[in-house]
Regions:
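Short low-polarity hydrophobic stretches
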Residues: 21, 86, 141-145
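The substrate-binding groove and active-site-proximal loops of carbohydrate-active enzymes
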Residues: 26-38, 61-79, 124-155
Length: 157
């Protein structure tokens, strides 16, 4: 069965979120940046806490570094297990892509990107000092992130 998500507007233009043809009120929370990188932590700490809070939806970070640990090789097993856990807990997910930048830093890029500062050059501070953040002018980095995000989007449709 194909799941449907849409916003239906009334005669005044006010929208209501519908999930599978039923109105849906998001009672949501957002996970800490790295919480979703550990299945056992999610199992023991996060899902029980979300239930205590009577949430029905969680914004779940998906870090590029966990999807493409080796360039061009995509592994969605962590995400697939998180989706399985969420379904078991009757929790809706809103997936947040952590790609090249999160809060202005390149914290969640794969190791192969972090190690190759020639191909994925860093931004510099005003005085010329090198930062650890990949430059938004680095076309190689933007293309690599876009490729990974495209695979992610196809996988999660």
């Amino acid at each position: 069965m194909k799941k449907t998500i849409e916003i239906k507007k009334d005669e005044k233009g006010f929208g209501t979120l519908y999930v599978n043809d039923e109105p849906f009120l998001i009672l949501g929370g957002e996970l800490h940046n790295s919480s979703s990188s550990n299945l056992q932590y999610m199992e023991k700490q996060v899902w029980p806490r979300l239930k205590e809070l009577n949430l029905n939806t969680v914004l779940l970070p998906v870090a590029w570094e966990n999807i493409e640990k080796e360039e061009g090789v995509y592994d969605f097993s962590l995400l697939e297990e998180l989706i399985f856990q969420a379904r078991r807990e009757k929790m809706k997910l809103i997936l947040l892509w952590f790609g090249l930048w999160k809060n202005g830093e390149s914290t969640y890029v794969p190791g192969w990107v972090k190690r190759d500062s020639g191909r994925f050059f860093r931004a510099r501070y005003k005085g010329g000092e090198l930062s650890q953040t990949i430059s938004p002018l680095c076309k190689n980095a933007v293309k690599a992130d876009a490729r990974a995000f495209t695979v992610f989007r196809i996988k999660t449709q």
